[in-house]
Protein backbone atom coordinates (compact mmCIF):
# COMPACT_ATOMS: atom_id res chain seq x y z
CA UNK A 1 0.00 0.00 0.00
CA UNK A 2 2.86 2.38 0.80
CA UNK A 3 6.43 2.51 -0.46
CA UNK A 4 7.87 1.76 2.98
CA UNK A 5 6.77 -1.87 3.11
CA UNK A 6 4.60 -4.25 1.06
CA UNK A 7 1.60 -3.61 3.34
CA UNK A 8 1.32 -1.87 6.71
CA UNK A 9 -1.33 -3.19 9.04
CA UNK A 10 -0.93 -0.88 12.05
CA UNK A 11 0.06 2.59 10.88
CA UNK A 12 -0.60 5.65 13.03
CA UNK A 13 -2.57 7.95 10.77
CA UNK A 14 -3.33 11.50 11.79
CA UNK A 15 -7.06 10.68 11.92
CA UNK A 16 -6.38 7.85 14.38
CA UNK A 17 -3.92 10.01 16.34
CA UNK A 18 -6.50 12.79 16.76
CA UNK A 19 -9.15 10.28 17.92
CA UNK A 20 -6.73 8.73 20.44
CA UNK A 21 -5.79 12.17 21.84
CA UNK A 22 -9.49 13.00 22.25
CA UNK A 23 -10.14 9.69 24.01
CA UNK A 24 -7.20 10.25 26.41
CA UNK A 25 -8.51 13.72 27.24
CA UNK A 26 -12.00 12.25 27.85
CA UNK A 27 -13.36 14.99 25.58
CA UNK A 28 -16.71 15.41 23.89
CA UNK A 29 -15.29 14.60 20.46
CA UNK A 30 -15.81 18.18 19.24
CA UNK A 31 -12.07 18.93 18.93
CA UNK A 32 -11.59 15.61 17.13
CA UNK A 33 -14.28 16.59 14.60
CA UNK A 34 -12.70 20.01 14.19
CA UNK A 35 -9.16 18.72 13.61
CA UNK A 36 -10.35 16.08 11.17
CA UNK A 37 -12.29 18.73 9.21
CA UNK A 38 -9.16 20.92 9.13
CA UNK A 39 -7.17 17.96 7.77
CA UNK A 40 -9.73 17.36 5.03
CA UNK A 41 -9.38 21.02 3.98
CA UNK A 42 -5.56 20.65 4.01
CA UNK A 43 -5.75 17.55 1.77
CA UNK A 44 -8.02 19.41 -0.65
CA UNK A 45 -5.68 22.45 -0.69
CA UNK A 46 -2.69 20.13 -1.25
CA UNK A 47 -4.45 18.64 -4.26
CA UNK A 48 -5.34 22.11 -5.60
CA UNK A 49 -1.73 23.31 -5.17
CA UNK A 50 -0.41 20.31 -7.12
CA UNK A 51 -2.90 20.94 -9.95
CA UNK A 52 -2.74 24.74 -9.88
CA UNK A 53 -0.90 25.20 -13.18
CA UNK A 54 -3.14 22.78 -15.06
CA UNK A 55 -6.33 24.22 -13.55
CA UNK A 56 -5.30 27.84 -14.30
CA UNK A 57 -5.21 28.72 -10.60
CA UNK A 58 -1.99 30.69 -10.85
CA UNK A 59 -2.06 34.46 -11.08
CA UNK A 60 -3.87 37.24 -9.28
CA UNK A 61 -7.60 37.29 -8.55
CA UNK A 62 -7.62 41.06 -9.06
CA UNK A 63 -8.24 42.05 -5.45
CA UNK A 64 -6.24 42.97 -2.35
CA UNK A 65 -6.97 41.33 1.02
CA UNK A 66 -7.58 43.15 4.31
CA UNK A 67 -3.89 43.22 5.20
CA UNK A 68 -2.84 44.71 1.86
CA UNK A 69 -1.59 41.59 0.06
CA UNK A 70 -2.59 40.83 -3.52
CA UNK A 71 -5.07 37.95 -3.48
CA UNK A 72 -4.13 34.97 -5.66
CA UNK A 73 -6.76 32.63 -7.11
CA UNK A 74 -5.53 29.76 -4.94
CA UNK A 75 -5.93 32.00 -1.85
CA UNK A 76 -9.62 32.44 -2.62
CA UNK A 77 -10.15 28.72 -3.17
CA UNK A 78 -8.20 27.72 -0.03
CA UNK A 79 -10.05 30.24 2.14
CA UNK A 80 -13.45 28.96 0.98
CA UNK A 81 -12.35 25.35 1.55
CA UNK A 82 -11.21 25.96 5.13
CA UNK A 83 -14.28 28.05 6.06
CA UNK A 84 -16.73 25.49 4.62
CA UNK A 85 -15.00 22.50 6.22
CA UNK A 86 -14.71 24.14 9.65
CA UNK A 87 -18.30 25.40 9.70
CA UNK A 88 -19.64 22.00 8.66
CA UNK A 89 -17.73 20.33 11.54
CA UNK A 90 -20.37 21.68 14.00
CA UNK A 91 -17.53 22.57 16.38
CA UNK A 92 -16.73 26.24 15.67
CA UNK A 93 -18.38 29.51 16.65
CA UNK A 94 -15.88 32.14 15.40
CA UNK A 95 -13.41 31.97 12.51
CA UNK A 96 -10.68 34.54 11.84
CA UNK A 97 -9.01 34.36 8.42
CA UNK A 98 -6.25 36.46 6.91
CA UNK A 99 -8.51 36.88 3.88
CA UNK A 100 -11.58 38.28 5.70
CA UNK A 101 -11.79 41.76 7.20
CA UNK A 102 -14.31 40.74 9.88
CA UNK A 103 -14.48 37.61 12.00
CA UNK A 104 -16.83 34.97 10.54
CA UNK A 105 -19.59 33.91 12.93
CA UNK A 106 -20.87 30.35 12.45
CA UNK A 107 -24.65 30.02 12.03
CA UNK A 108 -26.47 29.01 15.24
CA UNK A 109 -27.54 25.59 13.98
CA UNK A 110 -23.90 24.68 13.17
CA UNK A 111 -22.26 26.27 16.18
CA UNK A 112 -19.71 24.66 18.53
CA UNK A 113 -17.36 25.90 21.27
CA UNK A 114 -14.12 26.54 19.38
CA UNK A 115 -12.54 29.63 17.85
CA UNK A 116 -10.17 29.05 14.91
CA UNK A 117 -7.67 31.59 13.56
CA UNK A 118 -6.04 30.61 10.27
CA UNK A 119 -4.07 31.70 7.24
CA UNK A 120 -5.43 29.45 4.47
CA UNK A 121 -2.41 29.87 2.19
CA UNK A 122 0.67 31.47 3.72
CA UNK A 123 3.42 32.54 1.33
CA UNK A 124 1.03 32.70 -1.60
CA UNK A 125 3.20 35.34 -3.32
CA UNK A 126 5.43 32.30 -4.03
CA UNK A 127 2.70 30.28 -5.79
CA UNK A 128 3.64 31.22 -9.34
CA UNK A 129 7.30 30.21 -8.93
CA UNK A 130 6.45 26.87 -7.23
CA UNK A 131 8.17 27.68 -3.92
CA UNK A 132 6.79 25.99 -0.80
CA UNK A 133 3.62 27.45 0.72
CA UNK A 134 1.48 26.43 3.68
CA UNK A 135 -1.64 26.63 5.85
CA UNK A 136 -1.42 27.81 9.47
CA UNK A 137 -4.04 27.48 12.22
CA UNK A 138 -4.61 27.94 15.95
CA UNK A 139 -7.62 26.68 17.92
CA UNK A 140 -8.99 28.26 21.11
CA UNK A 141 -11.99 27.59 23.34
CA UNK A 142 -14.67 30.27 23.55
CA UNK A 143 -14.29 31.62 27.09
CA UNK A 144 -17.56 33.53 27.57
CA UNK A 145 -21.26 32.75 27.46
CA UNK A 146 -21.96 35.82 25.30
CA UNK A 147 -23.05 35.74 21.68
CA UNK A 148 -19.97 34.90 19.54
CA UNK A 149 -18.00 37.90 18.24
CA UNK A 150 -14.47 38.85 17.14
CA UNK A 151 -13.66 39.49 20.84
CA UNK A 152 -13.65 35.71 21.35
CA UNK A 153 -10.55 35.54 19.13
CA UNK A 154 -8.64 38.18 21.11
CA UNK A 155 -6.96 35.65 23.41
CA UNK A 156 -3.22 35.35 24.09
CA UNK A 157 -1.46 32.40 22.49
CA UNK A 158 -1.08 30.77 25.92
CA UNK A 159 -4.78 29.84 25.61
CA UNK A 160 -4.24 27.76 22.46
CA UNK A 161 -5.81 24.28 22.65
CA UNK A 162 -4.17 22.99 19.46
CA UNK A 163 -2.14 24.54 16.66
CA UNK A 164 -0.29 23.47 13.59
CA UNK A 165 0.73 24.11 10.04
CA UNK A 166 0.70 22.28 6.74
CA UNK A 167 3.64 22.65 4.37
CA UNK A 168 3.02 22.01 0.68
CA UNK A 169 6.58 21.29 -0.45
CA UNK A 170 8.25 18.30 -2.09
CA UNK A 171 5.71 16.38 0.01
CA UNK A 172 2.75 17.59 2.09
CA UNK A 173 3.56 17.67 5.80
CA UNK A 174 1.54 18.60 8.89
CA UNK A 175 3.16 19.69 12.17
CA UNK A 176 0.63 19.46 15.00
CA UNK A 177 0.62 20.09 18.74
CA UNK A 178 -2.19 19.64 21.25
CA UNK A 179 0.02 20.85 24.11
CA UNK A 180 2.05 17.65 24.56
CA UNK A 181 4.95 18.22 22.18
CA UNK A 182 5.06 18.40 18.39
CA UNK A 183 4.42 15.50 16.02
CA UNK A 184 5.03 15.46 12.25
CA UNK A 185 2.82 13.70 9.70
CA UNK A 186 3.41 13.17 5.98
CA UNK A 187 0.63 12.77 3.41
CA UNK A 188 0.84 9.32 1.82
CA UNK A 189 -0.68 9.80 -1.66
CA UNK A 190 -1.41 6.08 -1.99
CA UNK A 191 -3.58 6.13 1.13
CA UNK A 192 -4.84 9.70 1.00
CA UNK A 193 -3.93 9.82 4.70
CA UNK A 194 -1.37 11.61 6.87
CA UNK A 195 0.98 9.11 8.52
CA UNK A 196 3.14 9.78 11.61
CA UNK A 197 6.78 10.19 10.57
CA UNK A 198 8.30 11.85 13.65
CA UNK A 199 7.07 11.95 17.24
CA UNK A 200 7.87 14.58 19.88
CA UNK A 201 10.19 16.68 17.69
CA UNK A 202 12.74 18.80 19.57
CA UNK A 203 14.57 21.80 18.14
CA UNK A 204 18.38 21.99 18.54
CA UNK A 205 19.65 24.08 21.46
CA UNK A 206 21.75 26.07 19.00
CA UNK A 207 21.80 26.06 15.22
CA UNK A 208 24.04 27.24 12.38
CA UNK A 209 21.51 29.07 10.19
CA UNK A 210 19.98 32.53 10.36
CA UNK A 211 16.93 33.44 8.28
CA UNK A 212 15.67 36.95 7.53
CA UNK A 213 15.10 39.26 4.58
CA UNK A 214 18.40 41.16 4.40
CA UNK A 215 16.95 43.27 1.60
CA UNK A 216 15.46 45.39 4.41
CA UNK A 217 18.88 45.94 6.07
CA UNK A 218 18.55 49.68 5.42
CA UNK A 219 15.57 49.76 7.81
CA UNK A 220 16.93 47.44 10.57
CA UNK A 221 17.29 48.72 14.12
CA UNK A 222 20.72 48.67 15.80
CA UNK A 223 20.08 45.36 17.62
CA UNK A 224 19.14 43.46 14.45
CA UNK A 225 22.06 44.98 12.52
CA UNK A 226 24.48 43.98 15.30
CA UNK A 227 23.07 40.45 15.58
CA UNK A 228 23.27 39.80 11.82
CA UNK A 229 26.83 41.16 11.76
CA UNK A 230 27.78 38.73 14.57
CA UNK A 231 26.38 35.79 12.61
CA UNK A 232 28.24 36.76 9.42
CA UNK A 233 31.51 37.87 11.02
CA UNK A 234 31.86 35.97 14.34
CA UNK A 235 34.26 37.68 16.75
CA UNK A 236 35.30 34.42 18.42
CA UNK A 237 36.80 32.95 15.25
CA UNK A 238 34.01 30.37 14.79
CA UNK A 239 32.45 29.64 11.39
CA UNK A 240 29.82 32.13 10.22
CA UNK A 241 26.17 31.08 10.16
CA UNK A 242 24.62 30.03 6.86
CA UNK A 243 21.88 32.31 5.49
CA UNK A 244 18.61 30.79 4.27
CA UNK A 245 15.43 32.68 3.38
CA UNK A 246 12.52 31.40 1.29
CA UNK A 247 10.08 34.23 1.98
CA UNK A 248 7.31 31.76 2.77
CA UNK A 249 7.03 31.80 6.56
CA UNK A 250 5.88 28.19 6.95
CA UNK A 251 8.88 26.98 4.92
CA UNK A 252 11.34 29.15 6.86
CA UNK A 253 9.88 28.18 10.25
CA UNK A 254 9.80 24.47 9.40
CA UNK A 255 13.44 24.52 8.29
CA UNK A 256 14.30 26.28 11.57
CA UNK A 257 12.41 23.60 13.53
CA UNK A 258 14.18 20.74 11.70
CA UNK A 259 17.74 22.14 11.43
CA UNK A 260 17.84 24.63 14.32
CA UNK A 261 18.96 28.25 14.13
CA UNK A 262 16.91 31.44 14.12
CA UNK A 263 14.16 33.03 12.00
CA UNK A 264 13.70 36.79 12.28
CA UNK A 265 10.98 39.12 11.05
CA UNK A 266 11.69 42.00 13.43
CA UNK A 267 10.16 45.45 13.60
CA UNK A 268 11.97 47.97 11.40
CA UNK A 269 11.64 51.59 10.30
CA UNK A 270 9.24 50.59 7.53
CA UNK A 271 7.10 48.30 9.74
CA UNK A 272 7.56 49.62 13.31
CA UNK A 273 4.96 47.17 14.68
CA UNK A 274 6.28 44.23 12.68
CA UNK A 275 4.81 42.71 9.52
CA UNK A 276 3.46 39.28 10.45
CA UNK A 277 -0.02 38.89 11.92
CA UNK A 278 -0.29 37.75 15.54
CA UNK A 279 -3.44 35.62 15.55
CA UNK A 280 -2.99 33.39 12.53
CA UNK A 281 0.73 33.57 11.71
CA UNK A 282 2.84 34.31 14.81
CA UNK A 283 0.84 32.57 17.57
CA UNK A 284 0.50 29.16 15.86
CA UNK A 285 4.19 28.91 14.90
CA UNK A 286 5.32 30.31 18.28
CA UNK A 287 3.23 27.60 19.98
CA UNK A 288 4.80 24.87 17.82
CA UNK A 289 8.35 26.17 18.40
CA UNK A 290 7.84 26.47 22.20
CA UNK A 291 6.34 22.97 22.32
CA UNK A 292 9.50 21.75 20.56
CA UNK A 293 11.72 23.39 23.21
CA UNK A 294 12.51 26.61 21.33
CA UNK A 295 11.77 30.27 22.01
CA UNK A 296 9.55 32.79 20.21
CA UNK A 297 9.69 36.48 21.09
CA UNK A 298 8.64 39.89 19.79
CA UNK A 299 11.96 41.26 21.08
CA UNK A 300 10.27 42.59 24.22
CA UNK A 301 8.10 39.66 25.39
CA UNK A 302 7.21 36.06 24.49
CA UNK A 303 4.85 36.04 21.49
CA UNK A 304 2.37 33.79 23.32
CA UNK A 305 2.01 36.39 26.12
CA UNK A 306 0.85 39.20 23.81
CA UNK A 307 -2.77 40.20 24.52
CA UNK A 308 -4.31 40.89 21.11
CA UNK A 309 -6.16 44.16 20.59
CA UNK A 310 -7.45 43.53 17.05
CA UNK A 311 -7.86 40.44 14.88
CA UNK A 312 -5.35 41.56 12.22
CA UNK A 313 -2.77 42.94 14.68
CA UNK A 314 0.87 42.73 13.58
CA UNK A 315 3.85 41.95 15.81
CA UNK A 316 7.61 41.41 15.34
CA UNK A 317 8.61 37.71 15.37
CA UNK A 318 11.94 36.13 16.29
CA UNK A 319 11.96 32.38 16.92
CA UNK A 320 14.17 29.32 16.90
CA UNK A 321 16.81 27.52 18.95
CA UNK A 322 16.87 28.81 22.55
CA UNK A 323 20.56 29.80 22.58
CA UNK A 324 20.23 31.70 19.30
CA UNK A 325 17.12 33.61 20.39
CA UNK A 326 18.74 34.45 23.75
CA UNK A 327 21.76 35.84 21.89
CA UNK A 328 19.45 38.07 19.83
CA UNK A 329 17.67 39.25 23.01
CA UNK A 330 21.07 40.07 24.55
CA UNK A 331 21.73 42.39 21.56
CA UNK A 332 18.32 44.03 22.12
CA UNK A 333 18.99 44.58 25.84
CA UNK A 334 22.51 45.90 25.18
CA UNK A 335 21.21 48.43 22.64
CA UNK A 336 18.37 49.52 24.93
CA UNK A 337 20.81 50.02 27.81
CA UNK A 338 23.08 52.09 25.56
CA UNK A 339 20.37 54.60 24.62
Curated annotation (Swiss-Prot):
It is an enzyme of class 3 (hydrolase). Binds 3 Mg(2+) ions per subunit. The gene is FBP2. Mg(2+) 2 binds at residues 98, 119, 121. Its EC number is 3.1.3.11. Keywords: Allosteric enzyme, Calcium, Carbohydrate metabolism, Cell junction, Cytoplasm, Gluconeogenesis, Hydrolase, Magnesium, Metal-binding, Nucleus, Phosphoprotein. Pathway: Carbohydrate biosynthesis; gluconeogenesis. Residues 3-10 are annotated as: Important for interaction with ALDOA. One of its GO terms (molecular function) is fructose 1,6-bisphosphate 1-phosphatase activity. Catalyzes the hydrolysis of fructose 1,6-bisphosphate to fructose 6-phosphate in the presence of divalent cations and probably participates in glycogen synthesis from carbohydrate precursors, such as lactate. It comes from the Eukaryota. Its main location: other. Coiled coil: none annotated. This is Fructose-1,6-bisphosphatase isozyme 2.
